[in-house]
């Protein structure tokens, strides 16, 4: 395959001293660490929408992207050419996985029946490519936000007809995701929220959202879909206030509606910062609650208040992210999906490779640093010592449940002189830098 990216050869690992921009400097997919290859540890995935569908249009300007597969008039012809381009790209960058929305891979028709027919045609084409490609599907999902019918939401819409249409669309998306591989299925509620409470029945909307997800669970069981269900938190954009605000919010929702046994979370870095959390905070909260399923790997611009979906190149961020993944024991069905797009001014097809190379190298380097941090127990040792007071005496009584307010008051009256120790944040940040900058 050498039709759409003929100026780019297969991307290979050449090491950090290479001056070849079309090579990996830190990501060697065959390198073995702790019994697994880097490819197995990182499980990189390409986002179909940003990579092959996005055209560079923004609120202030027209499309800028030079995409040779878009030089057709019939939407189905474009969809077929995109599949060809996608698998050429996957092959050249050696991608283990890709992710898609239903409307990324096939255009909508005039009716739902026609739309489903379009999907069947493209899915059959993708299945043919999957027979000979190493690339598999990490997850699929349904686009329940772009079409004007979703102006008031999908499963949380005030219009029951929209709820029904959304259910039909997810039904089909589940079927094709199962047909293409069934690792995971993602729910992202871009329109599931509100602009003002003056016209919103929040209780009904949340109840309906839960009803919708239970229906999805039931149908997945019916068709034998064995993939992991994931919810992707995001606090806002396009909706002012979205119901899947952050990991804590999603977890509370899942537990309230008895859905926590079926769902984990897919955490996106830029969504975390939009919720005013560190990326690591969201990963840590998910990890300690056993719901960290997968990651959308990107970053945002800290000076902008919207989802910029940039390729992640900050080694500190990738290190702390992979620290949480390693502490979790690694990915099961999840992975690192590059929900990232080249900048509007990076419009040449070759830029797609350069962006992904940058992100893959950044996470590979981050993984290696994180692995050493975990192996050396740098932070674990400090944290264990910092909380040592809970290992014996009154602290042990608190943890075991033996203590109560009366016994704690008695202890406090007898030990009125409290001595705290420094948190040593600056030292720990310096140690982190030592690991980051070590050869």
Curated annotation (Swiss-Prot):
Matching InterPro entries: Xyl_isomerase-like_sf (IPR036237), Xyl_isomerase-like_TIM-brl (IPR013022), Xylose_isom_bac (IPR013452), Xylose_isomerase (IPR001998)
Pfam families with a match to the protein in the record: AP_endonuc_2
Binding note for cofactor: Binds 2 magnesium ions per subunit.
Binding residues for Mg(2+) 1: 232, 268, 296, 339
Main location: cytoplasm
Catalytic residue positions: 101, 104
Keywords on record: Carbohydrate metabolism, Cytoplasm, Isomerase, Magnesium, Metal-binding, Xylose metabolism
Top enzyme class: isomerase
Record-listed Mg(2+) 2 binding positions: 268, 271, 307, 309
Protein location: Cytoplasm
EC identifiers of the protein: 5.3.1.5
Gene Ontology BP, a term: D-xylose metabolic process
Cofactor: Mg(2+)
Sample GO molecular function, one term: magnesium ion binding
GO-annotated cellular components: cytoplasm
Parts of the chain that traverse the membrane: none
Assembly description: Homotetramer.
Record HAMAP family: Xylose_isom_A (MF_00455)
Family: Belongs to the xylose isomerase family.
Official protein name in the record: Xylose isomerase
Gene: xylA
């Amino acid at each position: 395959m050498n039709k759409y990216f003929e100026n780019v050869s297969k991307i290979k690992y050449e090491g950090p001293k290479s001056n070849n921009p079309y090579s990996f400097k830190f990501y060697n997919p065959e390198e073995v660490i702790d019994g697994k290859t880097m490819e197995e540890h990182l499980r990189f995935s390409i986002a179909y929408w940003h990579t092959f569908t996005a055209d560079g249009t923004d609120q202030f300007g027209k499309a800028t992207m030079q995409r040779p597969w878009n030089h057709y008039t019939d939407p189905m012809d474009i969809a077929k050419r995109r599949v060809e381009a996608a698998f050429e790209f996957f092959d050249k960058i050696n991608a283990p996985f890709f992710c898609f929305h239903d409307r990324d891979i096939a255009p909508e028709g005039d009716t739902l029946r026609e739309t489903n027919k379009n999907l069947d045609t493209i899915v059959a084409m993708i299945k043919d490519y999957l027979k000979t490609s190493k690339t598999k599907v990490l997850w699929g999902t349904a686009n329940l936000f772009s079409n004007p019918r979703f102006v008031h939401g999908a499963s949380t819409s005030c219009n029951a007809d929209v709820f029904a249409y959304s259910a039909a669309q997810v039904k089909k998306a589940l079927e094709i995701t199962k047909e293409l591989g069934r690792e995971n299925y993602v729910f992202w509620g871009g329109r599931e929220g509100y602009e003002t409470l003056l016209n919103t029945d929040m209780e009904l909307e949340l109840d309906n959202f839960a009803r919708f997800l239970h229906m999805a669970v039931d149908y997945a069981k019916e068709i034998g879909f064995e993939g992991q269900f994931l919810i992707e938190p995001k606090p806002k954009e396009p909706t002012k206030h979205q119901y899947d605000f952050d990991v804590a919010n999603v977890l509370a929702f899942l537990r309230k509606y008895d859905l926590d046994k079926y769902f984990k979370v897919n955490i996106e870095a830029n969504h975390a910062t939009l919720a005013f959390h560190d990326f690591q905070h969201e990963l840590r909260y998910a990890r300690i609650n056993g719901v960290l399923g997968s990651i959308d790997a990107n970053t945002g611009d800290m000076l902008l208040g919207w989802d910029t979906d940039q390729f992640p190149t900050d080694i500190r961020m990738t290190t702390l992210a992979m620290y949480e993944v390693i502490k979790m024991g690694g990915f099961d069905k999840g992975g690192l999906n590059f929900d990232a797009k080249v900048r509007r001014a990076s419009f040449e097809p070759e830029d797609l490779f350069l962006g992904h190379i940058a992100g893959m190298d950044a996470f590979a380097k981050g993984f290696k640093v994180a692995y050493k941090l975990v192996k050396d127990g740098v932070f674990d040792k400090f944290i264990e010592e910092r909380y040592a007071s809970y290992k014996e005496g009154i602290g042990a009584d608190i943890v075991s449940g033996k203590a109560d307010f009366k016994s704690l008051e008695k202890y406090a009256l007898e030990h009125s002189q409290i001595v705290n120790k420094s948190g040593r944040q600056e030292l720990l940040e310096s140690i982190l830098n030592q690991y980051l900058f070590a050869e």
